[in-house]
Amino acid sequence: MTKQRNVLGEDLEECSRDPLTGWYRDGCCNTDENDHGLHTVCAKVTTEFLEWCKEAGNDLITPHPEFGFPGLKDGDGWCVCATWYARAVEAGKGCPIFLKSTHENTLKILPIETLKKFAIDLS
């Protein structure tokens, strides 16, 4: 696979290997035309974010081993769906993100200015 790009226009960096994340379960927020959920935002999830997602209908806490999903806890890195992340931001529940590990396709959903407000990997 060709190296994909992040929202900063650089090579996409790894998001998490423990738990193993990504549309391809390769540790990166890589995507393709089959990823209808656009799992492209590398988030460091918080309890508040996870609880909000569950209440809103996207349970990221409960494990689903049949889908290779371990269930998430506070502090885990995970490639979150861009549309769900946008909804969380609107609701005031956005969690920290790693821009260097967030896929450029996220910019189709959220502007870079919004993403930078939650970035924890900019100096």
Where are these regions (language model features)?
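Short alpha-helix capping/helix-loop boundary micro-motifs
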Residues: 61-68
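Extended boundary segments
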Residues: 1-49, 112, 119-121
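Glycine- and charge-enriched low-complexity intrinsically disordered segments
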Residues: 103-123
